[in-house]
């Protein structure tokens, strides 16, 4: 029942005119939701952290007992599917990746394009993960961690350039 579930905007952010956000969804400041993305908080809460972005065509959803939490400065790439999972701060989820219920992605991670993170899988901080099912390839370098952070910052800076 969506009657009591309404999106909450906790600061300046940007949502594309054709993005869909329904139900119990929280958008922190400097976050952005891009074209054709869908955030369905009709079952559990979806929380998009400060400075995080959800790119074009991505779908975020939940199941009973499995809310979806995205930390600060996270980049959710194009056509990503997130379902009832946790993505910690300063991580990047690559184009077309899928992360399922109760999976937890640590801080400063890169989940490669088209990777599948199965239910209940925990990825430790600073990991590069690729494949289906996703396997830890190696630890990220300091330069790679900084590049992920800078990617999220570029999306935040773009918010001031958008004209509708």
Residue spans of the language-model regions?
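C-terminal end-helix/capping segment
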Residues: 138-141
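Adenosine-phosphate binding glycine-rich loop
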Residues: 143-145
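A non-catalytic, amphipathic alpha-helix used as a structural packing/dimerization or gating element
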Residues: 147-157
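Conserved small/polar residues in nucleotide/adenosyl-binding loops
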Residues: 162-164
């Amino acid at each position: 029942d969506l009657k009591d579930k309404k999106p909450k905007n906790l600061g300046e952010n940007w949502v594309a005119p054709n993005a869909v956000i329904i139900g119990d969804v929280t958008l922190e400041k400097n976050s952005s939701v891009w074209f054709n993305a869908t955030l369905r908080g009709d079952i559990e809460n979806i929380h998009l952290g400060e400075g995080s972005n959800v790119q074009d065509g991505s779908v975020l959803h939940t199941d009973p007992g499995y809310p979806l939490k995205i930390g600060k400065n996270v980049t959710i790439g194009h056509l990503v599917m997130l379902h009832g999972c946790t993505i910690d701060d300063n991580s990047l989820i690559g184009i077309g990746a899928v992360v399922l219920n109760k999976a937890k992605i640590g801080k400063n991670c890169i989940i490669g394009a088209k990777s599948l993170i199965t239910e209940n899988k925990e990825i430790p901080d600073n990991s590069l993960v690729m494949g289906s099912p996703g396997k830890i390839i190696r630890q990220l370098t300091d330069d790679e961690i900084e590049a992920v952070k800078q990617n999220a910052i570029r999306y935040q800076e773009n918010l001031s350039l958008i004209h509708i």
